């Protein structure tokens, strides 16, 4: 199944995954949840426990939610997931192209579009400091 995989801090990538529950769960790292934010025949498949598992913030979903962890976008039939069309692949790659950084400014959650390199630099754990020898 041709899908668009979107990982935190990375550019989206086109992938061909097996159309099985196990393969879909492997992509998102757990049990799946389908989200239907658009009127066309496409949906987001994400980890349904992303918040509880404290998965990293990934991309905003409109102006009302944030997807946690890796997700993929796939096409829809009347009762199943299917390949994205080339037009859908292009549309959703453009929509989710830029990784996003999330930070608090006071009590306001802010979102900044960034590059994978900048995301890695900002999100890297602080360097370990050399501990002073005990006396």
List each language-model region with its residue ranges:
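Short, extreme N-terminal segment that most often corresponds to the first beta-strand
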Residues: 1-11, 18, 134
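Catalytic phosphate/metal-binding cores of nucleic-acid and nucleotide-processing enzymes, i.e., regions
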Residues: 9, 14, 23, 34-40
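Non-Sec secretion/translocation targeting segments of pathogen effectors
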Residues: 123-135
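Short, structured protein-protein interaction patches enriched in aromatics and acidic/basic residues
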Residues: 38-63
